[in-house]
Structures are given as C-alpha cells and as structure tokens.
Amino acid sequence: MASRGVVGIFFLSAVPLVCLELRRGIPDIGIKDFLLLCGRILLLLALLTLIISVTTSWLNSFKSPQVYLKEEEEKNEKRQKLVRKKQQEAQGEKASRYIENVLKPHQEMKLRKLEERFYQMTGEAWKLSSGHKLGGDEGTSQTSFETSNREAAKSQNLPKPLTEFPSPAEQPTCKEIPDLPEEPSQTAEEVVTVALRCPSGNVLRRRFLKSYSSQVLFDWMTRIGYHISLYSLSTSFPRRPLAVEGGQSLEDIGITVDTVLILEEKEQTN
C-alpha cells in the first residue's frame, strides 16, 4: 500500500512537468499526439506500479519468515530463562534441605567426636559420662550421694551394712577415693587402651600399662561414679564376666591389646 501511494504521488507530480517539457521541446504538437504520449506515460506508470507491487510482495515473503523466526527465538529465550530460574530455585531448595538435614548433623556429630577425643586426651573423660562426680562440695554432694546409695541398695537388696552411710567420724574423705596411676603416653611401651562402655551409652577410654594391677579397673569405675558393689565388668566378645584376683596384672587377666569392657549393673538377688 505504501508503494502504491508513492507511485501515485510521483505520477501526479510528474504529469505537469512532462507537459511543460513537451510544450517547450515540441511547440507544434497536436492534441492527438499529446493524448498518445499521455497514454504511453500512463502505461509506463502502470507497468512500474505493477513491478513495484510484485517486488514488494516478493521481498515481504522473505522478510516475514525472518520476523516470525525472530519472535519465536524471543519466546524460546524467555521460556528458557523461566525454566532456568525454576531449576535454580529447585536446586537452591535442595541445597538448603541438604545443609539442614545432612551437612549440619554431620558437622555436629564431628564436633561431638572431637570434643570427646579432646576430653579423653586431657584426662577429663568424666565430663562425658552421666555418673556422679566424687569429691565435690561436702554439703550438697554428700546428701545426694547418700540418697542415691540408699535407693540403689533398696533396688539391689544389698545387706544392711551397705544401706547405712557411716557416721561423720567414719565418713570417707576425698583422700580415700582411689587414685589412678598417671596415664602413660600413647607411644610408651607395653601400653594398652581400655574402652569402658557405660550403661548410659557413653564410651570412656584410658591408657594403662600391662604391668598395672588389675584392681586399677575397679578404681577407675569408682572414680567415675560406678561403685563396684552395684556394677560389674565383663568382656565384649566373648561376653563373660571379667575375672580379677588380687595381685594379678592387666596382662595376667588377658588384657594385652586394646580392649573394650562392658560396665553393667549387677543382677538383683533375693
């Protein structure tokens, strides 16, 4: 349509100019010749209009697919951006769930293990157990120890002398709590590591020399809050009570390598 308008304007502006030129160049031209010339001009303009129209349509036929393809590409690009955005949101949500459900518990467990190892290396493994801390304040800890001892004695049906706490003059002091020998270094010769699995589920570890008296195991039990009258030791595999006799060393009772011992409550007796 635009091309036809251009042709029309060109024709209207060209007719007067052609007439003037003809009158100047051929002053004696007749009306018949003038009409014939105008017919030829009109025919030429018609042919020119037809050529322009066909050419424009032909060019538009090549141009329209390109525009269509460009629009399709823009739509596809927008669609891909939307899909990528959704994928990124889904991946971010998965990463958050992974951090919350897997990574964070794993880090907390790792920190707990490092804390347990630190306390075991510094000889403060009693902080990890749920036993009684002996040798504390004589006012409150004495009363709590007496109460727990009586309750344990009632549940275990122990003889009467064990249910009564000694008089103040006969009460054991902190000095009577068994002392453990100094823990040898890990690189020392004849050293073994004993892991003690408590009823609470905690596992305590300590190093001893094979030449130490086997009584040191019971002293260790008492020191972390498990009295030998209420608890016993047994081997993990095969499961059997640990036989300890006076004068025997750890090597004599079979503890020659790193060993796991089970600390369990004694059975009730009627």
Curated annotation (Swiss-Prot):
Name the keywords, alphabetized.
Answer: Endoplasmic reticulum, Membrane, Phosphoprotein, Transmembrane, Transmembrane helix
Q: Which InterPro entries match?
A: Ubiquitin-like_domsf, UBX_dom, UBX_domain-protein, UBXN8
Q: Which residues form the UBX domain?
A: 187-263
Q: Which residues lie on this side of the membrane: Lumenal?
A: 23-33
Q: Where in the cell is it found?
A: Endoplasmic reticulum membrane
Tissue spec. comment: Expressed abundantly in ovary and testis, and weakly in all other tissues tested.
Q: Name one GO biological process term.
A: single fertilization
Q: What is this protein called?
A: UBX domain-containing protein 8
